Swiss-Prot record:
The lineage of its organism: Eukaryota, Metazoa, Chordata, Craniata, Vertebrata. It is an enzyme of class 2 (transferase). Mg(2+) and Mn(2+) were both present in the kinase buffer but Mg(2+) is likely to be the in vivo cofactor. Disruption phenotype: Male mice are subfertile due to reduced sperm motility. The reduced motility is due to morphological defects in the sperm flagellum at the midpiece-principal piece junction caused by the disordered arrangement of doublet microtubules and outer dense fibers. Activated by autophosphorylation on Thr-197. This is Testis-specific serine/threonine-protein kinase 4.
């Protein structure tokens, strides 16, 4: 437990700033808000770099968040190092707050970009989608699922490269429980890792989540990737999420594309592979090998592919047909 930071008066330096200064951080402007805290830009004087500081109020946060989701988020982020993921640097806990020091992405997020400029050219969509796919391949190869992929969680650095953020719902799948599928990687209904409680936004949720069924979190991630790719090239979500029943009906049908937009058939095919029922839905391995994806990412991540192939090996064991229900 760190030092206390509860004393705060109108005339004094805010307590969170004093705590940050003790650790060498000069806190700047607010760059984001969450349910339980605020994200600030900060300057780390010891290494002369800009960072992001997520400050979580223990008073505002629920016990479930403080005791389960926040420790899990920190645990997951500590083991991750990838150029398309927001990197974790440090966590500091005091009597009233938790401070998480993260890599700073200075270009805003992809949702803001779409709202400002509209649909992406397919070349830009391909760049951002392939970067996201490489980040997710890295996660999945480590047995980690994100479970909250959405446009606002795709941050942009100063060169407009994607950085996947917000690991608050991420989860490590136990390595002792290998993932099984058919050799085609498509019979994923037999996968051994099912989550029971939904995490994330309904607009990006796969049909099995909307139906309240246990779901495969690896495949829920790839469904969300399909929603993201569609929105990149169309500038609107593929399904109307204003009404849950309507949303569920729409996700049961094949997604359609506006006639007035020029979208390549290869791009459409990938979207259709992602936005389909779980037994036929593309895995991250399928995405890496997709013809449209390969146009933008010809160099394959060999280490991740090797690990993913090992995860998806078929098995003759009866365990293949069993489901292990895991808690959130």
């Amino acid at each position: 437990m760190g030092k206390g930071d509860t004393s705060e008066t109108a005339s004094a330096t805010p307590a969170y700033r004093s705590v940050m200064e003790e650790y060498g951080y000069e806190v700047g402007k607010i760059i984001g808000h969450g349910s339980y805290g605020t994200v600030y830009e900060a300057y780390y004087t010891k290494q002369k770099v800009m960072v992001a500081v997520k400050i979580i109020s223990k008073k505002k946060a629920s016990e479930d968040y403080l005791n389960k989701f926040l420790p899990r988020e920190i645990q997951v982020m500590k083991v991750l190092r990838h150029k398309y993921l927001i990197n974790f640097y440090q966590a500091i806990e005091t009597t009233s707050r938790v401070y998480i020091i993260l890599e700073l992405a200075q270009g805003g997020d992809v949702l803001e970009w779409i709202q400002r400029y509209g649909a992406c050219a397919e070349t830009l969509a391909g760049k951002w989608f392939s970067q996201m796919a490489l980040g997710i391949a890295y996660l999945h190869s480590k047995g980690i699922v994100h479970r909250d992929l959405k446009l606002e969680n795709l941050l942009l650095d100063k060169r407009e490269n994607v950085k996947i953020s917000d690991f608050g719902f991420a989860k490590m799948v136990p390595s002792s429980q290998p993932v099984h599928s058919s050799p085609s990687y498509r019979q994923m209904n037999s996968l051994s890792h099912l989550s029971q409680t939904y995490c994330g936004s309904f607009a990006y949720a796969c049909p099995e989540i909307l139906l309240g069924l246990p779901y495969n979190p690896f495949l829920s991630d790839t469904w969300s990737m399909g929603v993201i790719l569609y929105t990149l090239v169309v500038a609107r979500l593929p399904f109307d999420d204003t009404n849950l029943k309507k949303l569920l009906r729409e996700t049961q049908k094949e997604v359609t594309f506006p006639a007035n937009l020029t979208i390549s058939q290869e791009c459409k095919n990938l979207i259709l592979q992602l936005l389909r029922q779980s037994t036929k839905r593309a895995t991250i391995l399928d995405v890496l090998r997709d013809p449209w994806m390969l146009k933008f990412q010809p160099e394959q991540p060999s280490n991740e592919i090797r690990l993913l192939e090992a995860m998806y090996q078929p098995t003759s064991s009866a365990k293949r047909h069993q489901s292990l229900e895991i808690t959130t």
